[in-house]
């Protein structure tokens, strides 16, 4: 007697290739487990990139320009001082990031699901590496960010990492521009620094030791000093760390493909964007090609909300 409910029928490689939206969902699930770019920037809207570019303004001082005058005591019937401000409108172009991976006719014929899933995983990994590297490079290239050295290498167990981070937080707060350094800021590190944080004696002494979610027990670093999170990536140098207020530092907006282009997309929701997928035939040899793409425009709008810590 059959059990109820019956198991779902196994799907074949050939059937998957006819469902590009499902491939898009798989890629989104794999990409956004590791990609940090959506955590660095505030997500914009498709309307912001209509026409292939996003217009933005770099943050100004919260005060008026002092020339020709500032607030002052004014005598009766005397002229009042006047101060204005300047605005500069900039444009960030939409970039087309994409890659294709072939699925051979033999893999389809033999239903080699392992080859198909490896192709998906490798495509997702390449998208993550490329997009995150571009985002980090954009942050570091902005002349308006602040750079400060670490007190000592974070590879040394006794280095006061908390002091280095809080100094960077104070730098952000000290801009007096409404940035949050001590509440919800994001710390970005190379993945090799995870082990150094776990071994750091200053952090061990400061963080709870008896809790079930304690970092040495779980292997997951708990945020400290008011941080909203710690993001680990291979896209930043091992001797660098970035602290930023992700709610204002920059904006990333995505241009959707035109329906006539034949791409399919699965919307993952939240701050994430769809990885658009197109499957088409290649006759020499008789392969199927999976193309995955994303069209972002990224702008650093508040470089004062970013601090680069060197020598970690």
Indicate residue ranges for each PLM-predicted region.
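Extended, solvent-exposed, turn-rich assembly/linker loops in the middle of proteins
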Residues: 144-219
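Residues forming anionic-ligand binding surfaces in small-molecule and nucleic-acid pockets
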Residues: 94-106
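Structural beta-strand/beta-sheet cores of well-ordered domains, especially the beta-sheet scaffolds
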Residues: 99, 183-187, 286-288
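Assembly/oligomerization interface modules of large self-assembling protein complexes
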Residues: 29-97
């Amino acid at each position: 007697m059959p059990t109820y409910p019956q198991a779902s029928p196994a799907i074949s490689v050939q059937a998957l290739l006819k469902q590009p939206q499902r491939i898009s969902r798989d890629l989104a699930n794999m990409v956004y487990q590791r990609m940090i770019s959506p955590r660095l920037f505030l997500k914009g809207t498709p309307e912001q990139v209509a026409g292939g570019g996003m217009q933005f303004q770099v943050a100004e001082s919260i005060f008026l320009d002092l020339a020709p005058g500032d607030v002052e005591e004014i005598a009766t019937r005397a002229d009042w001082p006047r101060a204005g401000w300047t605005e500069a409108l900039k444009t960030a172009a939409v970039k087309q990031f994409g890659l294709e991976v072939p699925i051979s006719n033999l893999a389809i014929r033999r239903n080699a699901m392992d080859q198909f899933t490896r192709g998906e995983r490798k495509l997702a990994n390449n998208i993550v590496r490329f997009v995150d590297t571009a985002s980090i490079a954009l942050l570091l290239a902005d002349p308006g960010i602040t750079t400060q050295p670490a007190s000592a290498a974070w590879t040394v167990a006794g280095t006061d990492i908390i002091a280095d981070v809080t100094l960077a937080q104070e730098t952000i707060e000290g801009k007096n521009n409404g940035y949050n350094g001590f509440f919800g800021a994001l710390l970005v590190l190379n993945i090799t620094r995870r082990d150094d944080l776990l071994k750091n004696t200053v952090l061990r002494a400061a963080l709870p030791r008896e809790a079930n979610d304690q970092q040495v027990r779980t292997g997951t670093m708990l945020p400290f000093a008011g941080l909203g999170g710690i993001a680990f990536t291979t896209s930043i140098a091992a001797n660098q760390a970035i602290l930023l207020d992700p709610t204002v530092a920059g904006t990333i907006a995505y241009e959707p493909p035109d329906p006539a282009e034949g791409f399919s997309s699965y919307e993952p929701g939240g701050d994430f964007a769809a990885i658009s997928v197109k499957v088409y035939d290649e006759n020499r040899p008789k392969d199927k090609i999976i193309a995955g793409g994303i069209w972002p425009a990224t702008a650093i709008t508040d470089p004062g909300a970013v601090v680069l810590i060197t020598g970690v």
